[in-house]
Regions:
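Surface-exposed acidic/polar loop and edge beta-strand patches at domain peripheries
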Residues: 1-149, 160-163, 170-331
Length: 331
């Protein structure tokens, strides 16, 4: 397939951009938070990203800040989102406002600045200006063969220093994710979320990769997707280099995620494996997300700070740049 960029319409009636090379096909939805809705590996025909069970919501505008996880879920399509200026529960923000669940960037419409082809490279550039925070986020996506590079430039437009949570939320689904799928990473430390009340992991416990303490006191091996229903939230840290890989030997396919650990020193490992019986998953979600970011735990900025998390501090006018890569390859 020749390299190109084209305009398409995806589920829900949303206009989308499709970047195509000989190695992959990537779709993004500018009006829905610049969500990267699919990444199809050309060799196997597998879409490595996950979509929510209810599908992409109908095309609409707003709300752009979710007071609760339920409101967020009504406009959450799955795929790969960017979370800014908050991650997790809604949190008090400067000026007496609130930053909603997972922030604004994944809900606001983004402006397409340009797209095109440069040799074997398909590219697109987009940006968004947040409403409840004086921030602009610019995103350049470049697809070469089966490797997507997403470079984000975050700018504090004000003269006032501001603390934020900034993270990527790529979520992976079946058939890449299956019982026995292997998880490899450069992390050396694991810490389970301290609000876990069920599932198979003990809450608020540290260990060394690939282990995490189980509720019964034994050790769980996080490097293999289990063959039973459960849900997990674990924070990975102390990266030698910022990378993780999901490997399905039966498919002969791996997805590799890479990032700059000096900007994103931690990553959230979230799994919902047909477990939660009520809203929002109803035992219908089978997903594994590896989410590099600035800060944990994923409980909102104020709570994260109370629990020792380190937000990203942007001075007035400061810019920060990070590149996150997603590629597919043979194991």
């Amino acid at each position: 397939m020749s390299t190109g960029v084209r305009e398409v319409t995806v589920e829900g009636g949303w206009p989308a951009l499709e970047l195509v090379t000989a190695g992959a096909r990537v779709q993004l939805i500018p009006e829905l938070g610049c969500d990267i809705g699919s990444f199809v590996d050309a060799r196997t025909g597998v879409d490595v990203l996950w979509r929510v069970p209810w599908g992409i919501p109908p095309r609409s505008t707003g709300p752009f800040s979710a007071a609760t996880e339920t409101e967020w879920g009504e406009r959450f399509p799955g795929g790969w989102n960017v979370l800014l200026p908050n991650g997790g529960a809604a949190t008090p923000a400067p000026g007496g406002t609130t930053w909603g669940f997972h922030g604004e960037a994944a809900l606001l419409p983004w402006t397409v600045l340009g797209s095109g082809v440069d040799g074997e490279r398909a590219w697109a550039e987009l940006e968004v200006r947040l409403i409840r925070a004086p921030l602009r986020l610019h995103r350049r996506l470049e697809l070469v063969d089966s490797a997507l590079a997403v470079t984000e430039t975050l700018t504090n437009l004000s003269s006032v220093p501001i603390e934020v949570m900034w993270s990527q939320h790529p979520s992976f689904g079946a058939p890449l994710i299956a019982a026995g799928t292997r998880i490899e990473t450069g992390a050396t430390v694991t810490e389970t979320d301290d609000t876990l009340t069920d599932g198979d992991l003990a809450a608020g416990e540290r260990s060394t990769w690939p282990h995490a303490p189980a509720q019964g006191g034994s050790a769980v091996d996080l490097s293999v997707v289990p063959d039973f229903a459960t849900h997990r939230l674990v924070y990975l840290s102390e990266f030698e280099t910022g990378w993780a890989r999901l490997v399905n030997d039966d498919l002969g396919l791996a997805a590799r995620l890479e990032w700059d650990a000096s900007v994103y020193p931690s990553a959230w490992l979230w799994q919902e494996l047909n477990d939660t019986p009520g809203h929002p998953w109803w035992q219908m979600a089978y997903v594994c997300a590896i989410e590099p970011g600035t800060t944990y735990p994923g409980q909102g900025l104020a709570v994260a700070k109370e629990k020792g998390g380190t937000p990203l501090l942007l001075a007035g006018g400061e810019q920060r740049v990070v590149t996150v890569g997603l590629s597919t390859e043979a194991p």
